[in-house]
């Protein structure tokens, strides 16, 4: 079949070219956005007197038929159509004959695909915010339930300081809150209509870009027609937003994987979100979080691929731009499914609170609190750090933990350690009331002492939960102010 653009060619394109050149297999998901753009465009052509009433009614009727066919999944796509834009135009001509050929008056596929993508990106950004809000809600609820579920906190994957599960989980709330805010910022920035920019230099027809902008629902438009069709920074930014979400999901997935091992034994995944082994009958594998972790590289890879494609292109439009869609669509699908699965995993997993608390009493995670206390008594913190470091060494040599030390052992240890200190610090350490230090050696009491803003003490955590609720409510209300481009 002849191409709609084939007037200056004497040969049909090679079959391999058709296969290589076509994007219809993946850009067909833009069909309703493309139809919206065409409806707004043809209405503007009529309002500006570029087409007459009869043509306008015929074209609009044809576009409505195609919309219904698409809804019923009856529209057929062929490689020879190249892309969704040509496919729709070809179908319109089949339905309405010669009048269908007037649809593309004063328009290029360059501004056509740009407006399709901007509407698509705006709508998907808000959909993703809603998915993030679902995860934030689950995390917030978990945190509220576990303000006093004590556990070790980690640095370098080594037990570091005591905290609570509520405090630990709430850190993900704030990561996702920033991801959601970033998407809303993106939605505002993408609120630009490129329609009417033509191939890149506008058009000589008396069009009204303001009319199509308002009909479609954009609040702004690209001020430069070349910029409108030659830019893919919005696609790039959107994939960055997706990458950030996946990176945060991956870090959460990594912890769920670790916590579900017998070595940690902090959680158990629900059977509905785990798999077995083909050879080892006892296995319960965390395949879902592992795949979330694994798919993160795929999304970040798409970001790198598009940035690399985009970086060296001259103005204005280049066919290379077609490469933005497959990676973007794949990234979007990956993030949407990962967010849905994560909220389900978090809301169904079993939390082994006793094991978490037990782990607190198997290490020296309260060492910092002891050093802090010594500093409050007048010993310079760096000396206090050294004192507690030597105390840890003493305990390890005698196969003991802090809470197992007696008052007498602590007195003897401090006197031995004091010899390495300056005179003032020696005096303070040897006269120290060791009963108070023994009291600090309880990791749970250490948690309650950490009451600075953002810390895990119950009072501080309750305040943070209140702040989280405010941000959650604000985001929820913001999302309601955005309308989908699709009816």
Curated annotation (Swiss-Prot):
Belongs to the lyase 1 family. Argininosuccinate lyase subfamily. Coiled coil: none annotated. It is found in: Cytoplasm. It catalyses: 2-(N(omega)-L-arginino)succinate = fumarate + L-arginine. The keyword Transmembrane helix does not apply. NCBIfam families: argH. GO terms for biological process: arginine biosynthetic process via ornithine; L-arginine biosynthetic process. Gene3D superfamilies: Fumarase/aspartase (C-terminal domain), Fumarase/aspartase (Central domain), Fumarase/aspartase (N-terminal domain). HAMAP family: Arg_succ_lyase. Keywords: Amino-acid biosynthesis, Arginine biosynthesis, Cytoplasm, Lyase. It comes from Natranaerobius thermophilus (strain ATCC BAA-1301 / DSM 18059 / JW/NM-WN-LF). InterPro entries: Arg_succ_lyase_C, Argininosuccinate_lyase, Fumarase/histidase_N, Fumarate_lyase_CS, Fumarate_lyase_fam, Fumarate_lyase_N, L-Aspartase-like. GO terms for molecular function: argininosuccinate lyase activity. PROSITE patterns: FUMARATE_LYASES. GO terms for cellular component: cytosol. Its EC number is 4.3.2.1. This is Argininosuccinate lyase. Pathway: Amino-acid biosynthesis; L-arginine biosynthesis; L-arginine from L-ornithine and carbamoyl phosphate: step 3/3. Pfam families: ASL_C2, Lyase_1. The keyword Nucleus does not apply. It is an enzyme of class 4 (lyase).
